[in-house]
Amino acid sequence: SGGFDFSFLPQPPQEKGPMGLMGPRGPPGASGAPGPQGFQGPAGEPGEPGQTGPAGARGPAGPPGKAGERGVVGPQGARGFPGTPGLPGFKGIRGHNGLDGLKGEPGAPGENGTPGQTGARGLPGERGRVGAPGPAGSRGSDGSVGPVGPAGPIGSAGPPGFPGAPGPKGELGPVGNTGPSGPAGPRGEQGLPGVSGPVGPPGNPGANGLTGAKGAAGLPGVAGAPGLPGPRGIPGPVSGATGARGLVGEPGPAGSKGESGGKGEPGSAGPQGPPGSSGEEGKRGPSGESGSTGPTGPPGLRGGPGSRGLPGADGRAGVIGPAGARGASGPAGVRGPSGDTGRPGEPGLMGARGLPGSPGNVGPAGKEGPAGLPGIDGRPGPIGPAGARGEAGNIGFPGPKGPAGDPGKAGEKGHAGLAGNRGAPGPDGNNGAQGPPGLQGVQGGKGEQGPAGPPGFQGLPGPAGTTGEAGKPGERGIPGEFGLPGPAGPRGERGPSGESGAVGPSGAIGSRGPSGPPGPDGNKGEPGVVGAPGTAGPAGSGGLPGERGAAGIPGGKGEKGETGLRGEVGTTGRDGARGAPGAVGAPGPAGATGDRGEAGAAGPAGPAGPRGGPGERGEVGPAGPNGFAGPAGAAGQPGAKGERGTKGPKGELGIVGPTGPVGSAGPAGPNGPAGPAGSRGDGGPPGLTGFPGAAGRTGPPGPSGITGPPGPPGAAGKEGLRGPRGDQGPVGRTGETGAGGPPGFTGEKGPSGEPGTAGPPGTAGPQGLLGAPGILGLPGSRGERGLPGVAGAVGEPGPLGIGPPGARGPSGAGVNGAPGEAGRDGNPGSDGPPGRDGLPGHKGERGAGNPGPVGAAGAPGPHGAVGPAGKHGNRGEPGPAGSVGPVGAVGPRGPSGPQGIRGDKGEAGDKGPRGLQGLPGLAGQHGDQGAPGPVGPAGPRGPAGPSGPPGKDGRTGHPGAVGPAGIRGSQGSQGPS
């Protein structure tokens, strides 16, 4: 009951054990029927890391086994060496940024609104009033008043009244209609494509995931690095012919689709230059085999810029230029098996960069791209000046209202000046300095925790620390009064907890030390006879409570990478039998606290007496002394952390009532003072495991146990976040554009100028420094391994990029020319994240034929014209994988054979283990920006802009002439006197 629990020993397997070591890779056979799953071999010792053997075909999954008990973890399989990374393909040159379209001319000003009508004239002043009646005649002698004389004549009209105040201003006339829109400005020509920014250094390599579930198909043979762009001449035909592809290395394991072929620069057609290196925009080629590129061809002539074509579509747009003849392939790395995923290998150094091929001659310019998008309409021109406001005339006498003044005419719009010539192209801007290598990408997120490996071997439980001798049971004092309850000292010793299965690195649990203030409730010490509870001294049979064996030093937190193998769950120590509670005597009167007697040897726990009623709660006595800590038990091997046993119920603390009379136990004598702690004797046998108390604090970590062999690989974590792309170096300054002359009269759009010839290729940027490898992320879980797809034949060409490719010379003999001198590496493009596996296409036919021998380095032959596209070859049977020969010298680029029709996309092969990510190179410097092309003729006049705001009110018109005086009215009749 209290002894060791041997459940930690290996039990019959419940979960699948680790995979056995993989055998060497066989040649790829036809996919056979999946074999049955082999038996699991016993775990071997961890071997030296072997070379990764080829992956065997994956057997079908067996029926799920019963959950066995955890087996012993087998050794981790050796880590295969990472395959050599293919050379990075060159990144296509980025199309130049187009020049901005010319701004449309300002629209003609809208006509001015007609001035409002002149306000009505004021009313004429009143006529003079009729004069007052003359004085009455003198009275007659009889005093009678004579008749009132006739009214005097109407006084003449008074002077004209002041002119009436000007009538209110006429309302503003309606806003003139917006002048007709001027014709649209000519479409801005498409600017020259901007120079591609320097290729940023590739983001840090994503972590290599362990291979887990079927990864995506192997990394594409790294696409050959694009040849470094030659110094950019003035971008000539914007779409140069595709440069020769570098020699391609042998296909790596079928990877996911390679990056799209470099995009040719779309542009307007320059005159056809000699074929150059930039390819017509390729469809996404099959995964290019990376190879070294051929030697740099002479730069093409620098043509004037063609008109700007529409920007080529990304990626899949044109057909990739014919593939260069296949140079000697670099040896394909042997495909490592997707073995057990070992821990990720250290990143291999990046394979040597292939030398960049020389840029081929500038290819014929593509046709002129369609006109660029129309420039945006110019802003509305300023509103024409309002017609001059007439001067105010003198205020005449008010006359009849004059006619409304004419509306002021809108001033005529001046003709637009002729456009000045475009300034000569400014000198090419210098290349921007190489940007510093991008920051190291953020470390990928932590991979998800793989499934726990099988538990490590369970360490044998260390010997239990010797249990101190049990003190002798003190004699039961007479139950004095309940002393004040001491702080709950260590509760009666929890019998030394039976060792919980050797808990991982916790050393064997020594005797439980004082669990700090109120230690976890141990077994509720026997409420035994509630003796003088004074100090809950070493009640019960526990000797001095040993310290809890120091919890083994917790192994350092493993890297949080792969989750450490979860050791076996140690068996939870069985709970010792709970000591039976002593009988609680009936509460007696609280006696005085007796002296604590010496602790006698612990007697066996008596049978539980009936629980006494609660005694009175005495005052809290002083805490008993802590027992000495027993020596720490030897640290067991770290097993997996035992599962936590269920926490035993915490003994209920009875209400401490008044101490009742002790029951069947004799009357307790007063507790004597505590005797000195006895020396720690040899550990008695472990007591029964009490119910687990509350967990004590974790002690200092014990020494790490022996690490069990690694478990099978965990499930692959998610791929770490891709590091941010390195900063792009600053783009070289664009040559300054000469100042534009004044806009010319809008003419018909002239024909596009002749495209200039392509400028010489820019010089290659320096080879980037390798960035530090990114941190490897945990591998994703390995998926089912698909059969490797046969590399598809070259697919049919997609639509050509804008502009037909110039004719290429006839293709030379198909055999590889002797390798030329390798060009320098271009900057590696950043790796895109691995593409998802596409739906498997039909398997392309693999052309038969062995690669020709690598010739000695010959001079590069001239590019022949592009031959007609070859038909699909019949699918040869895949030959057995030969061993990789040494890499031959890179031959010069042979003439490109005709571009084969693009085969159906091969089925995606398994994603091979992810090769080590090469360190990112520094971004090459930009080629110089080509000079801007000449300004095209001014386009037609843009539509009129919106009308401007209504003009201010016109000035008041001159007053009209004073009309003739009206006819004098007839005299009114005399009013009554």
From Swiss-Prot:
The modification 5-hydroxylysine is found at K91. The keyword Glycoprotein applies. It is found in: Secreted; Secreted, Extracellular space; Secreted, Extracellular space, Extracellular matrix. Residues 641-650, 902-913 have a biased composition (Basic and acidic residues). Its main location: secreted. Prolines at the third position of the tripeptide repeating unit (G-X-Y) are hydroxylated in some or all of the chains. The modification 4-hydroxyproline is found at P10, P13, P28, P34, P344, P347. The keyword Glycoprotein applies. Residues 258-267, 300-309, 441-450, 537-546, 678-687, 735-744, 798-817 have a biased composition (Gly residues). Keywords: Extinct organism protein, Extracellular matrix, Glycoprotein, Hydroxylation, Secreted. It comes from the Eukaryota. These protein fragments were extracted from an ancient femur bone collected at Cueva Rosello in Peru. Belongs to the fibrillar collagen family. Type I collagen is a member of group I collagen (fibrillar forming collagen). This is Collagen alpha-2(I) chain. The lineage of its organism: Eukaryota, Metazoa, Chordata, Craniata, Vertebrata.
